[in-house]
Amino acid sequence: MENTENSVDSKSIKNLEPKIIHGSQSMDSGISLDNSYKMDYPEMGLCIIINNKNFHKSTGMTSRSGTDVDAANLRETFRNLKYEVRNKNDLTREEIVELMRDVSKEDHSKRSSFVCVLLSHGEEGIIFGTNGPVDLKKITNFFRGDRCRSLTGKPKLFIIQACRGTELDCGIETDSGVDDDMACHKIPVEADFLYAYSTAPGYYSWRNSKDGSWFIQSLCAMLKQYADKLEFMHILTRVNRKVATEFESFSFDATFHAKKQIPCIVSMLTKELYFYH
């Protein structure tokens, strides 16, 4: 693999440029009607991509080279999955909150699901607008079951490409839709969310200036290959393996040389999710 510049999505590292070496379905499909989300609504749903590349000078945060590659790759991938993709670039923290609030107030009753992708600098529990931090919980709370009723019981996917701390992973050698008869039942307001983080809590998240981030590269590749074959959690497991085994940082600074990364999936989904129906 060609060596190109690689960075991490953390506000605390400046001018770091290491390199990389590297539903509902008929029973004939094998998908259980009772155990999978209904994905045959008239529309698949919205996919909101917030792509923050340039930050206000007052923040001290560097430009995120390579993020436009991620945004373009995501746009193509989710359009191919029949999502309505809306790209937003360089949003302030206030604009992020306003956008998410407005989207949560839309009528999603004819949509099967919702996807939000956040590409930015970050820390644990935080994503950065171009002028400062936003608590991730503030963003996702707009879509809770008690606040966005038209998405209640539907999968809400948040994909987050950002650092979650300043730790570096050195690696180690190894051998190796609510049914009608259930409509009156209550469900937890936090149910049916999935958070796909690019890295484990506390760690850096690596991004390549030419090819985009390791995580988004891998996610798009696995969705393109398996979205019409596998359940989403199985796809994400393959994403984890791809990031863990196929990528490693290269830097003349020994501190940042030969580092690894593992994505982290937090699922509150209550059914299996298939993108095909």
From Swiss-Prot:
PROSITE patterns: CASPASE_CYS, CASPASE_HIS, CASPASE_P10, CASPASE_P20. One of its GO terms (cellular component) is nucleus. Its main location: cytoplasm. The keyword Cell membrane does not apply. The modification Phosphoserine is found at residue 26. It is found in: Cytoplasm. Keywords: Acetylation, Apoptosis, Cytoplasm, Hydrolase, Phosphoprotein, Protease, S-nitrosylation, Thiol protease, Ubl conjugation, Zymogen. Residues 1-10 have a biased composition (Polar residues). InterPro entries: Caspase-like_dom_sf (IPR029030), Caspase_cys_AS (IPR033139), Caspase_his_AS (IPR016129), Pept_C14 (IPR002398), Pept_C14_caspase (IPR011600), Pept_C14_p10 (IPR002138), Pept_C14_p20 (IPR001309), Pept_C14A (IPR015917). GO terms for biological process: anterior neural tube closure; apoptotic process; B cell homeostasis; cell fate commitment; cellular response to staurosporine; DNA damage response; epithelial cell apoptotic process; erythrocyte differentiation. Residues 1-9, 10-28 form a propeptide. The modification N-acetylmethionine is found at residue 1. PANTHER family: CASPASE, CASPASE-3. Belongs to the peptidase C14A family. This is Caspase-3. It comes from Pan troglodytes. The lineage of its organism: Eukaryota, Metazoa, Chordata, Craniata, Vertebrata.
